[in-house]
Regions:
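Cleavable N-terminal signal peptides of Sec/SRP-targeted secreted and luminal proteins
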Residues: 2-21
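N-terminal accessory/cap region of cofactor-dependent oxidoreductases and related radical enzymes
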Residues: 18-356, 360, 375-378, 382-519, ...
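Mobile, glycine-rich extracellular loop/lid and propeptide segments
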Residues: 369-372
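Residue-level "edge-of-site" marker
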Residues: 537, 550
């Protein structure tokens, strides 16, 4: 008997545990053997282009070849948990709460090596994937790690099977039925009389800086056909379409694949299925650059700039469907840049801003191309934080919420409240529910608006999903007109009434088969084991309803619709309950999502060692910080799109309190402050760790 086993046995006997630890060791060892003897799920090499009959939305989300290792480890972990339950005769809950089993599990299976952060301690630049942002907990916020959680997941079997049962034991209603009955119908909500479509667009842009959850592929490496040949695959979780569905008559099934699994605690403890975030959990403009060294290098152009194509727009190489022969898919740091034209246009805006800054940094400092790229990338991350917290969050969260979660920026000086004990990792409920509030703002149409602010052309949203034509046509000459349309068109209010384009006409394939984004959101929450709506209200210290009539932040019509589809108030899915709340007067989202988003954005600030207001090598000099604070989203649009006029409050509609002003009257940062900085020679390549 080895030293560790003797130690464990002594510990067990001294505490008079019912099960001796040696027996526990044997049970776990047998479960390990069972796991490795059984064949594991395998993945082939999938297509790099969308199959002719495939769906671009699912193709975008499918796991990449370099994520196969993570998925394999996740499936092996789940297989082990299943075998351990069978071998031990215990429930998953008992195993998870057992000190003996957890201790033996760590001893026999945990081989995680904590990365060394010595070379990052004095680095001015964050790593591409977020590694060692936190020197004590190097993997917090890192790309390709599990989403963290505020609440323990609720799986039907405790650890893996999606949440499908309600409080009374009955099967939860189909997400499509919820979508039909709760998220549609009734009196149409009028457009927002204060905010514009640019708010929706920037919200999507920020979301793509923070979260991207890949889905499982089949054994051939391609997306699963869960309504066809792959229907029996355990990773299929197809959505049932009601027989009386008006939009999908004759269809009974909507394709849906589960998110790839990853172990709890990096495989060092017995726990439930977790989901992977492909991106780093920091506001660092990662959607421009990617979250790996490989992506950074692929997009890097000459003298520290990003690669472009004719018209100073993104280079070709992304994923999309093109409607015109001369069009091309745009390539950006995030694969979803072609998802919606307004998003694609914003990618062009920030691409141009990077290149403008890089060229001037090169001129005033004489730095090498690599150093110019790194310094410009750092500045762009700071600008993203400045706009996100200085303009975007004040537009969606109420004043009290921003104060409660310390989200207001300083006007001068440094902010020195970085806390290494704060885990910034994006939480599962944020990625899967709260940040999806913007799906309620998807407009029925996009368009162009001339310099005289007259609409010149309109496009139905369902016709432009995954089609970059509006952006790339005529080498991007119409992007300013698209921006004016976004600035001058009222936003949709965040409520239960979802646009037809998002609920019925999402991402049609070549056969005209479409999807329902709301059904996807509800099903994804169940796939991830998100607890029901009331549990999140409790977490946020909001009133919790015991009956439908006690729902406090829903109007009577919404309450009636929720009661019509759910058996019990405790069954309400968090997305359905959160998106249908009535926002407070100064907020865009309802109280629950306001709480969750405020909490997460606080962690993203307090838990980021490279937060731009920070003093030290991770931040900027006082002069540089002063210049960054001059930057506003309105001036960014002016400079990159050659606009003449714009409203100062860029996410609000033009009005007497928010008139258009000359772009020339808005300040821009003075990059001569960077000439005063001293850049010692450093081998910067060592700060890129991801392949």
């Amino acid at each position: 008997m080895g030293f560790i086993q003797v130690f464990l046995l002594t510990t067990c006997l001294s505490k008079v545990y019912v099960v001796h630890c040696v027996e526990v060791d044997d049970i776990i060892a047998d479960a390990i053997q069972d796991t490795y003897l059984k064949p594991q799920r395998d993945f082939g090499v999938g297509n790099d282009t969308i199959p002719e009959t495939g769906n671009s939305f699912a193709f975008l989300q499918k796991q990449k070849n370099d994520e196969d290792t993570i998925a394999r480890a996740g499936f092996k972990y789940l297989s082990f948990i299943k075998n351990l339950i069978q071998r031990s005769g215990k429930s998953f809950g008992d195993l998870e709460s057992s000190d003996e089993y957890q201790r033996s599990f760590r001893t026999q299976l945990c081989d995680t090596i904590t990365p060394s952060c010595k070379k990052y301690k004095y680095s001015s630049y964050r790593s591409a994937d977020g590694l060692c942002n936190n020197l004590r907990n190097p993997t917090w916020g890192v790309a390709l790690q599990a989403h963290a959680r505020y609440l323990h997941p609720v799986y039907d079997d405790g650890y893996n099977s999606p949440r499908q049962r309600g409080r009374n034991g009955g099967v939860l209603p189909s997400p499509r039925e919820i979508s039909n009955k709760v998220l549609a119908g009734g009196v149409t909500t009028p457009p927002d009389d204060k905010r514009n479509l640019m708010l929706f667009t920037f919200g999507q842009f920020v979301d793509h800086d923070l979260t991207f959850t890949p889905i499982v592929v089949g054994r051939n490496g391609n997306t699963l056909d869960c309504c066809g040949v792959d229907a029996s695959d355990p990773e299929c979780y197809a959505i049932e379409i009601p027989t009386n569905d008006v939009r999908f008559p004759g269809r009974t099934c909507m394709d849906f694949s589960r998110s790839i699994p990853t172990p709890t605690d990096e495989g060092c403890s017995i726990g439930p299925r977790q989901q992977v975030n492909r991106l780093s959990s920091f506001i660092d403009a990662g959607m421009l650059y990617g979250d790996s060294k490989r992506f950074n290098e692929n997009l890097n152009g000459r003298v520290g700039t990003l690669r472009t194509s004719s018209g100073d727009i993104l280079p070709p190489g992304g994923i999309c469907h093109t409607s015109q022969a001369e069009d091309f898919c745009q390539l950006a740091g995030d694969e979803r840049s072609n998802e919606f034209p307004s998003l694609g246009g914003l990618h062009v805006v920030f691409l141009r801003l990077h290149n403008m800054i890089a060229k001037e940094i090169r001129q005033v400092t004489g730095l090498s191309s690599q150093d110019v790229f790194l310094e410009t990338k750092k500045i762009m991350g700071a600008i993203m934080q400045q706009v996100a917290y200085g303009e975007y969050l004040p537009a969606i969260l109420g004043k009290d919420t921003r104060k409660k979660f310390c989200l207001n920026l300083r006007r001068n000086g440094y902010w020195n409240k970085y806390n290494p004990n704060v885990n910034p990792t994006v939480k599962n409920v944020i990625a899967t529910a709260a940040l999806r509030y913007g799906h309620s703002q998807i407009p029925p149409e996009l368009g162009y608006m001339t310099r005289m602010f007259a609409i010149s052309r309109v496009f139905k949203s369902e016709d432009v999903f995954m089609d970059p034509n509006i952006v790339v046509t005529q080498q991007g000459q119409n992007i300013p007109d698209l921006a004016r349309f976004l600035l001058g068109t009222p936003a949709r209010k965040v409520d239960r009434q979802i646009e037809n384009a998002a609920r019925n006409e999402l991402f049609p394939d070549v056969n005209g088969v479409t999807f329902d984004l709301m059904s996807f959101n509800i099903q994804r929450g169940r796939d991830h084991g998100l607890p029901a709506y009331n549990e999140w209200r409790k977490l946020c210290k909001l009133p919790v309803a015991t009956t439908f009539s006690e729902l406090q932040d829903h109007n009577s019509d919404t309450i009636a619709r929720l009661q019509d589809v759910y058996d019990h108030v405790d069954d309400i899915d968090v997305f359905a309950g959160g998106i249908s709340e009535t926002p407070r007067a100064d907020a865009v989202v309802g109280p629950l999502f306001e709480c969750l988003l405020g909490w997460q954005f606080k962690e993203l600030r307090f838990g980021d060692r490279y937060w731009y207001e920070t003093k030290g090598i991770e931040g900027f000099s006082r002069g540089q910080l002063r210049e960054i604070r001059k930057m506003t989203f309105s001036k960014i649009l002016c400079e990159t799109l050659n606009l003449d006029e714009i409203q100062k409050e860029v996410f609000n509609l033009v009005g007497s309190k928010n008139p258009r002003v000359k772009c020339s009257s808005l300040p821009f940062m003075d990059l001569s402050e960077w000439k005063k900085s001293f850049f010692p020679f450093v081998d910067w390549s060592r700060f890129f760790t991801s392949g």
